[in-house]
């Protein structure tokens, strides 16, 4: 049985909340710690505990972000991926896909709860639905993409950070 939740608790124009997370490399980071330093693309997606088509969607997102990472780095934009898997599962996932960006574990779903990220529970595993945020250097949420699909996502978020003209 699959169940879903929804209801974002933040909106465009809000400050990114203060939420601490641990990356697969053990690095601890509060989302607010980048304020004043870098713009941020923050993407929640289903990770290694999903199976079948849901896993394929998560893998596609991880790979799309991997492809975009050099461009983001060149433009001075931080990229953080977040799944609700534990650190051990994520370490294997990062190694398997060769992900160059920080992937944070929200196993206790603290960030998911604070931001109101939709989740899906399947076979006892609760995973974040694909949701992406563009955050300005001053910490303001510039864009939110719910049910985010990999194609065109990074371009849309970069346009929010660096508007044309």
Q: Model-flagged regions — what are they?
A:
Residues 1-165:
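Chalcogenol-based redox active-site neighborhoods
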């Amino acid at each position: 049985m699959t169940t879903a939740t929804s209801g974002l608790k933040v909106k465009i124009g809000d400050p990114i909340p203060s939420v601490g997370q641990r990356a697969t490399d053990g690095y601890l980071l509060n989302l607010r710690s980048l304020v004043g330093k870098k713009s941020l693309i923050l993407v929640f997606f289903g990770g290694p505990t999903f199976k079948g088509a849901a896993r394929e969607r998560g893998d596609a997102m991880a790979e799309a972000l991997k492809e975009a990472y050099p461009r983001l780095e060149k433009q001075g934009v931080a990229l953080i991926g977040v799944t609700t898997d534990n650190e051990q599962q994520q370490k294997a996932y990062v190694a398997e896909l060769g992900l160059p960006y920080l992937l944070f574990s929200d196993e206790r779903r603290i960030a998911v709860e604070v931001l109101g990220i939709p989740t899906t529970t399947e076979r006892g595993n609760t995973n974040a639905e694909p949701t992406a945020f563009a955050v300005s250097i001053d910490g303001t949420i510039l864009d939110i993409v719910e049910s985010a699909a990999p194609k065109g996502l990074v371009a849309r978020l970069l346009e929010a950070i660096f508007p044309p003209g």
